[in-house]
């Protein structure tokens, strides 16, 4: 059995996710096991555009963007699980969220770690659990659904 990690750098992430600045919220995948789990990171800096208005005196990353980053991690795991190469023909869309909970704020200088796990997949809809952590402390948890959809041209 190999201890080699499956990683993705930003160049590979850009091949799988359609998001671009300022909405690409995954910087690196540290490890993944198709059909099971994926561990990704987001380095949160003061240069993030959302900090200009949320909030100028006490910058806090919006919770919806933490959830969006978690959804992007599930999309990467879905692609890797289906052994699907990126193309312009299909995307995995954020389809739903349940049981979202926020435990603490995320501030400039934090490194968010996303741990997502595939629970089930049926007819192109995947159900995942996700946890976001900073320094090992849970920031946010949720159950996320994503759906594969053909792109109409």
Swiss-Prot record:
The reaction(s) this protein catalyses: a (3R)-hydroxyacyl-[ACP] = a (2E)-enoyl-[ACP] + H2O
Protein name: 3-hydroxyacyl-[acyl-carrier-protein] dehydratase FabZ
Organism whose genome encodes this protein: Shewanella pealeana (strain ATCC 700345 / ANG-SQ1)
The EC number(s) this enzyme carries: 4.2.1.59
A Pfam cross-reference name: FabA
Active-site positions on this chain: 54
UniProt GO MF annotations: (3R)-hydroxyacyl-[acyl-carrier-protein] dehydratase activity
UniProtKB keywords: Cytoplasm, Lipid A biosynthesis, Lipid biosynthesis, Lipid metabolism, Lyase
Cell compartments where the protein resides: Cytoplasm
NCBIfam families: fabZ (TIGR01750), PRK00006.1 (NF000582)
Keyword Lyase included in the entry's annotation: yes
A GO CC term assigned to this protein in UniProt: membrane
Gene3D superfamilies linked to this entry: Hotdog Thioesterase
UniProt record similarity statement: Belongs to the thioester dehydratase family. FabZ subfamily.
Source organism, top-level taxon: Bacteria
Any GO BP: lipid A biosynthetic process
CDD domains tied to this protein: FabZ
EC class: lyase
Function: Involved in unsaturated fatty acids biosynthesis. Catalyzes the dehydration of short chain beta-hydroxyacyl-ACPs and long chain saturated and unsaturated beta-hydroxyacyl-ACPs.
Gene: fabZ
InterPro entries (UniProt xref): FabA_FabZ, FabZ, HotDog_dom_sf
Broad class of the protein's primary localization: cytoplasm
């Amino acid at each position: 059995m190999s201890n080699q990690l499956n990683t993705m750098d930003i160049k590979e992430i850009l091949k799988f996710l359609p998001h671009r600045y300022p909405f690409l919220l995954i910087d690196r995948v540290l490890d993944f096991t198709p059909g099971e789990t994926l561990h990704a990171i987001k380095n949160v800096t003061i240069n993030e555009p959302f900090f200009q208005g949320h909030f100028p005196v006490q910058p806090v990353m919006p919770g919806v963007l933490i959830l969006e980053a978690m959804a992007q991690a599930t999309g990467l795991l879905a692609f890797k699980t289906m052994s699907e190469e990126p193309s312009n023909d299909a995307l995995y869309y954020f389809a739903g969220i349940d049981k979202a909970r926020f435990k603490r704020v995320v501030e400039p200088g934090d490194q968010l770690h996303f741990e997502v796990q595939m629970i089930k997949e049926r007819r192109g809809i995947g159900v995942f659990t996700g946890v976001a952590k900073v320094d090992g402390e849970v920031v946010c948890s949720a159950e996320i659904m994503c759906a594969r959809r053909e792109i109409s041209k």
